[in-house]
UniProtKB/Swiss-Prot annotation:
Its main location: membrane. Residues 654-673 have a biased composition (Low complexity). Residues 1-24 form the signal peptide. It is a multi-pass membrane protein. One of its GO terms (biological process) is protein secretion by the type IV secretion system. This is Uncharacterized protein RBE_1264. GO terms for cellular component: plasma membrane. The keyword Nucleotide-binding does not apply. It is found in: Cell membrane. It comes from Rickettsia bellii (strain RML369-C). Residues 624-673 are annotated as: Disordered. The lineage of its organism: Bacteria, Pseudomonadati, Pseudomonadota, Alphaproteobacteria, Rickettsiales. The chain crosses the membrane at residues 224-244, 253-273, 410-430, 436-456, 469-489, 562-582. Residues 642-653 have a biased composition (Basic and acidic residues).
Length: 673
């Protein structure tokens, strides 16, 4: 009897052990899950813990790509009869951890930190996944492949939004690109709004669709009205010619015909023209010649200036590799490229530690012209921080933090001031160009009203004002571009000195981009090696870092070449301060030079961020002095500047309230006599 019981116990233990081993694969997913480069989410957060509490390959699981939904087994608390509970959720379903953990597992459903986390079933690339919110966005904790991956979202055609707003990045050759995308997106959108209209079919002409074509429809009616007015103008001229022989003069008739043809062609048009959306519309001379000319002047002039500026080979793209009609992207790519280059985007430097560039086919690039590559650039020191291994990170701020951890606060402040001023000025140029382009489109849209005004002496002033604003908005971005080109030239000279750059062109699946490798010149290479940009590149590559133990915690910092780095950075900072003050008047200078309106009120101020920082610093300083019982240093002291302003205001009020006793009133009354 005892032997029989022992055998039963052994059989039960074996069966339970087999069951446990069948459920022992927690963390198994039907499809592979994405991993982060530093492994932070998988090892140090609730995300990794939830992954290790889900099993998709347990008995009863479903990894069949043809079956809908996602089936998984959610872990129960230790000692339960079943290691986990099976669930099946369809796409779009959501469940809280507390709802999935029905046995109040103290490690999951009863955990106050985890119980309110919501898991949602959604498509993730080509898989259907159970997604969990994390600090880095929604991330999948379990996935299953789909037999029919979802088709990419189609670009809406029945819309006023330009197609380049969705696909514009494909025309760029810069790894970091947003300027060209913004310009082309706005241009195509303005084309649709003002002139072309949407591409909706006639069967969809509902009230909502009609509202989308309000501007082109109104201009069509406007052209009809202008055409009728021109007919009346011809009739009145004919009456005058019959009644007055002076109007029958051949010179006046010839001048009348020339002016009439000019006004007719540039206001209401003489024939159709296919615009960008391949939809034929009745175009006028302003759309065929005026608008392309006005919007093309600025990028053409700016591109000429930019090609003559900057370091040798840095961010100079091959315009022949752009698609037809998108060569203007070269200007904006050079701006975006410099933002990434100055701020340490590793791939732009042709640093490929993670093998990203190796997956692309490398074509012919620039000419090395005898320049020398930097030796051992791809071998980082063991003390370099993990943040330098992230693909696409802006390593400038990581390096600045390394200087800060070494106690070099001046370098940190100087670097941040340089970055803020540089980005602010470039943002000002981009917004200035966009505002001028919008103004040109508006001026073109109302051109049927103002162009006929040149026919009459009393209204010719309105035409002159319209023409002045149009030409000014076409030329102002070119003036500002000259200022930006000067800024970039000074920065390149101060940061990289005589360093040279070799372009590498990459291509894969119609995606083209270029990188620029910093190289030593064949002569005077030591000048380049002492430059701020060369030393920063070594820090980006993981060289020169040190590790120290501070209060039992290891920190990584930069303590080498501090004096030379500070000297070079202060030189860059001097140029930044000069351009900061010069940028305050660049808008007024451009407006005066082109005899047009000033755009400050509708563009991003190039000094706004720095001014806010200065005001914040002054406020903190005054607050610190107030806590120490000292009077504030600003002009708002009750007994100093504030009282002076009060006295001045009081004097002004007295002058105003003096009424007829004031000298101004006496002068007015005497003038009346």
């Amino acid at each position: 009897m005892k032997i029989h019981n022992i055998i039963k116990i052994i059989i039960v233990v074996c069966l339970e052990g087999f069951a446990l081993t069948s459920f022992a694969g927690f963390g198994d997913s039907c499809a592979s899950l994405p991993t982060t480069t530093d492994g932070y989410l998988e090892s140090d957060t609730a995300y990794g813990y939830i992954i290790r509490s889900i099993d998709m390959k347990a008995p009863g699981g479903n990894c069949d790509a043809n079956k809908p939904g996602i089936t998984f087994c959610f872990k129960n608390k230790d000692g339960s009869s079943d290691p986990c509970t099976m669930y099946t959720l369809n796409q779009g379903d959501s469940k809280k951890i507390s709802d999935l953990s029905k046995d109040n597992n103290p490690d999951l459903g009863a955990n106050p930190i985890l119980k309110n986390i919501v898991l949602t079933v959604q498509t993730w690339q080509n898989d259907i996944c159970l997604l969990m919110p994390t600090s880095r966005g929604p991330m999948p904790v379990a996935c299953k492949a789909l037999s029919n991956p979802p088709a990419p979202p189609s670009v809406p055609s029945c819309s006023n939004i330009g197609q380049s707003c969705y696909t514009g990045a494909n025309y760029s050759q810069s790894l970091i690109n947003f300027s060209g995308l913004a310009v082309q997106c706005l241009k195509e959108t303005l084309d649709k709004i003002f002139f072309v209209g949407n591409s909706c079919g006639s069967q969809s002409q509902s009230s909502e669709i009609t509202n989308l074509t309000a501007f082109p429809t109104f201009q069509g009616y406007l052209k009809n009205a202008i055409g009728a007015a021109l007919i009346l103008y011809v009739m009145f001229f004919a009456f005058n010619m019959v009644l007055n022989k002076e109007y029958g003069n051949p010179d006046k008739i010839a001048l009348f015909v020339i002016k009439l043809l000019f006004v007719t062609y540039f206001s209401i048009g003489l024939g159709p023209l296919n615009f960008n959306s391949s939809q034929p519309t009745q175009e006028n001379g302003m759309l065929k010649y005026g608008l392309p000319l006005l919007t093309g002047i600025a990028p053409e002039f700016a591109q000429i200036i930019f090609n003559a500026a900057g370091s040798k080979g840095l961010c100079v793209f091959d315009t022949s590799k752009y698609q037809s009609g998108y060569q203007f992207y070269a200007l904006w790519d050079s701006i975006d490229c410099r933002i990434g280059y100055y701020l340490g985007l590793d791939l732009l430097y042709n640093i490929d530690k993670n093998g990203v560039l190796s997956s692309f086919a490398r074509g012919d690039g620039g000419n090395s012209s005898g320049s020398i590559p930097i030796p051992n650039l791809g071998n980082p020191d063991k003390n370099s921080p993990n943040a330098l291994t992230s693909v696409g990170s802006l390593r400038f701020f990581t390096v600045m933090f390394g200087f800060f951890m070494a106690g070099n606060v001046i370098i940190l402040i100087s670097g941040l001031v340089f970055a803020v001023i540089f980005l602010s000025i470039l943002l000002y140029f981009i917004t200035h160009y966009l505002v001028c382009m919008i103004t040109i489109y508006v001026m073109t849209y109302v051109s049927p009203i103002f162009i006929p005004m040149m026919l009459f002496n009393r209204t010719k002033g309105y035409f002159d004002g319209w023409l002045k604003v149009s030409l000014s908005c076409a030329l102002q971005p070119a003036v500002v571009a000259g200022f930006i080109a000067l800024l970039i030239t000074m920065y390149d000279s101060a940061i990289f000195k005589n360093c040279e750059f070799l372009r590498y062109d990459y291509e894969k699946n119609n995606v083209k981009f270029s990188t620029f490798e910093l190289r030593l010149p064949a002569s005077s290479a030591e000048v380049c090696q002492e430059s701020f940009g060369y030393k920063m590149l070594n820090y980006y590559a993981g060289k020169g870092w040190e590790e120290h133990l501070v209060i039992l915690f290891p920190i990584k910092s930069i303590a080498k070449d501090v004096v030379s780095i500070l000297a070079e950075l202060l030189c860059v900072l001097v140029f930044s301060v000069i351009f900061y003050y010069f940028s305050k008047s660049i808008s007024q200078f451009a407006a005066d030079l082109t005899n047009g309106p000033k755009m400050d009120a509708v563009t991003a101020s190039p000094t706004k961020i720095v001014d806010l920082v200065k005001q914040g610093a002054a406020f903190i300083k005054d607050a610190a002095q107030a806590t120490q019982g000292k009077p504030p240093s600003s002009g708002d002291m009750p007994g100093d500047g504030g009282s002076k302003r009060s006295e001045g205001q009081k004097g002004d009020d007295s002058f105003i309230s003096s009424g007829g006793n004031s000298s101004g009133d006496s002068l007015s009354s005497s003038g009346g006599k």
